[in-house]
């Protein structure tokens, strides 16, 4: 009897163990959603549908006669925009495979926007054109990899052709023309950007903010702007605007924290003896030292202010060196054996005026040697070229901008929040396009640079017929920007494309705003080479990947499980 009972217990343990394993496996499977797999023509066809629907929404914004797109937002009023990348980002499809296609086009638009800052609509319609032709060719039995090689060869040839025809720009008028085109023909925006670049230089910082009036305004901050304000409000000298204003001040630049009274006594004596205001820039000013500065300001009448040095680590130290060069002073650092108690007048910097608010400090007209400042700028430019980190490059460019040109603020005005938002989108595009044009030069606008580059592809030799078809795919795609701009202006796009290809003037194009054929360069209708080049390269790259796709894996939609009724009844039972 005892043996029988122990056998039952053993079986029960095995049963429980088996049940636990089954439960474990079933819970593991519940953690992973079921997948749906699409193959071949069906997969590419569904992807293409997503690409086409997104491209149709984006392409209506292209050109001077392009239309607005209204986007519903999860909060606030709907957004009205003519910015291609904004439209693309807002689109999401319920169908998972369609969404894969749309997401890849968004990737193209974002990549183009990140590199060139404009050209997202052009990149989107090029992607659609290349992928559409690629799908047809693969369905007809072409080798997808040979098509891709042909597409790559054609793109390389077009980029070389565009670079050979690019013209560098330098005058304010040319800069204004680029800005005007990218702002959908609004001349005022183009001129505003040209004025800003004239004021702060091509490497200067230009920022965009909301204006407080109906009109667009340009505010220029000459000199260096530090993102740190006064440590204590006791340093304020102008109660009306709550700022500390120092004229012809001495500037102490120190790498470490200042904590003892003795550390600030010597520099205060120098300021008092010279009857000049004093600014202290350091990692921090603590307790006793801070109290000493405030007491001297309140009782002895010395105009003094202290701010924390902006940045962290090596970036902070480098920024302080820049400030020392700009103001003609020295960075007081323990590494060189310097001591605050032995500071003399030659170690202090100077400038014409400093304005310090609770948030920032603006140093105007530093007393540094112009040659030393230029040498420091060259060092930073060299460091930018050698740097491989995007973060480091960004910080170096900020330092260069502060040293070389100052800061311009474009204040965008309008009658409503929606109008200001729409104008800011266009100003951002125009500013990015202008910077790209200054960097790599310009080509005739309105899509004609790509259109005429398609002629050169007739001479391109390929290894086989399928590669030749790849070249023809790019040839046909290069016609779509002109076709789309003309169509949005209410003209038959194919007629405009045909007429332009019949003649030999590489600068002749269709001015959609006026409805006539003009010399695009003379008319000021120009595109930055960097924008056109980036749009084509990114579009061809992603389109080629989609064309060579043979399977797509997506999640199946989850089944909605019936929720049991509350109270006495059971879910799903009728009485």
Curated annotation (Swiss-Prot):
Belongs to the chaperonin (HSP60) family. Its main location: mitochondrion. InterPro entries: Chaperonin_Cpn60_CS (IPR018370), Cpn60/GroEL (IPR001844), Cpn60/GroEL/TCP-1 (IPR002423), GroEL-like_apical_dom_sf (IPR027409), GROEL-like_equatorial_sf (IPR027413), TCP-1-like_intermed_sf (IPR027410). It comes from Cucurbita maxima. Gene3D superfamilies: GroEL (3.50.7.10), GroEL-like equatorial domain (1.10.560.10), TCP-1-like chaperonin intermediate domain (3.30.260.10). This is Chaperonin CPN60-2, mitochondrial. HAMAP family: CH60. One of its GO terms (molecular function) is ATP-dependent protein folding chaperone. One of its GO terms (cellular component) is mitochondrion. It is found in: Mitochondrion. Residues 1-32 form a transit peptide. Keywords: ATP-binding, Chaperone, Mitochondrion, Nucleotide-binding, Stress response, Transit peptide. CDD domains: GroEL. GO terms for biological process: protein refolding. PANTHER family: 60 KDA HEAT SHOCK PROTEIN, MITOCHONDRIAL. SUPFAM superfamilies: GroEL apical domain-like, GroEL equatorial domain-like, GroEL-intermediate domain like. The lineage of its organism: Eukaryota, Viridiplantae, Streptophyta, Embryophyta, Tracheophyta. Induction: By heat shock. Implicated in mitochondrial protein import and macromolecular assembly. May facilitate the correct folding of imported proteins. May also prevent misfolding and promote the refolding and proper assembly of unfolded polypeptides generated under stress conditions in the mitochondrial matrix. It comes from the Eukaryota.
